[in-house]
Amino acid sequence: MIRHVAVFRFVPEFTMEQREHWMSLLRALPRHIPELRSMSVGPDVLGAPTSHELAIVADFDDLDGLAAYTRHPAHAEVLKISAPVKVSLATVDFEIPDAS
């Protein structure tokens, strides 16, 4: 399995209401992108100086699934919302070994 993690910081003008709407669109992506096995989305709860404001954790069977997600039109639509309000984005993609 491949795990995709993305953490964001946003401009202050990106309101909590707008963030909640954006997160609801992200949470709907597994219904539109079959390669997306699971997705967790949530705001930071600590507010530490080094914290990002929001995180996404998404799981895929393989790298092909991750590639399908990144180029899927539904994913592109969600990115259109975050692009103008994003201050920073950091991502990491890593393999989770089989439990067997």
Describe each model-derived feature in a short phrase.
Residues 70, 79-82:
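Short, flexible helix/strand-to-coil boundary loops that buttress conserved ligand/catalytic motifs
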Residues 1-53, 61-71, 94-100:
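Short S/T/G/P-rich N-terminal loop/turn motif that feeds into the first structured element of a domain
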